[in-house]
Amino acid sequence: MKNNDSKISKYISLILRHKPEEIGLKLDEHGYLVVLDLIEGINKSYEGFSMDDLERIVREDSKGRYSFNEDKSKIRANQGHSIKVDLGLEEIKPPKVLYHGTGRKYLESILKNGLIKKERQYIHLSKDRETASIVGKRHGDLVILEVDSESMFNDGIKFYLSKNNVWLCNYVPKKYIKELNLEEVF
């Protein structure tokens, strides 16, 4: 099953973040699916998929997208949901600045309206420019935004930290955003 891991990982991401109904399932209130049900559902498209395959995909996922509960009977995505789930995250004070990588085609709208979560449950922010760069390159011509997270927090905006170290918030008003000059960054 190893040669299909990338495809299956994307499929798992789709199921756990957006469309569990693709395999006839529904996430619980905390975003979990029963592992055996997920494996059975995946087998409808990828015959022979097993618990060993799932554990390997979770373990080898460089972005740390998924986590099991303690006894590995349930699994969920750590963030990125378009479905409302309670991840049990607690408010936490962020570092002074965070970063958001995006494509130049979105810059005008962001500078006018701020960062809006759209179909996602939260805005995703990175603790460093390198991670923001990796994320942003997926959206075309790279732009890295610096977010004054300390001022946001001091002004009452809540921040959360996902299990895989992605900073989350509901909205980033435009006054806290600054475009970085990439020549100075790298």
UniProtKB/Swiss-Prot annotation:
SUPFAM superfamilies: ADP-ribosylation (SSF56399). One of its GO terms (biological process) is tRNA splicing, via endonucleolytic cleavage and ligation. Its EC number is 2.7.1.-. Signal peptide: none annotated. InterPro entries: Ptrans_KptA/Tpt1, RNA_2'-PTrans_C, RNA_2'-PTrans_KptA, RNA_2'-PTrans_N. GO terms for molecular function: NAD+ poly-ADP-ribosyltransferase activity; tRNA 2'-phosphotransferase activity. Keywords: NAD, Transferase. NCBIfam families: PRK00819.1-4. Removes the 2'-phosphate from RNA via an intermediate in which the phosphate is ADP-ribosylated by NAD followed by a presumed transesterification to release the RNA and generate ADP-ribose 1''-2''-cyclic phosphate (APPR>P). May function as an ADP-ribosylase. Belongs to the KptA/TPT1 family. This is Probable RNA 2'-phosphotransferase. The lineage of its organism: Bacteria, Bacillati, Bacillota, Clostridia, Eubacteriales.
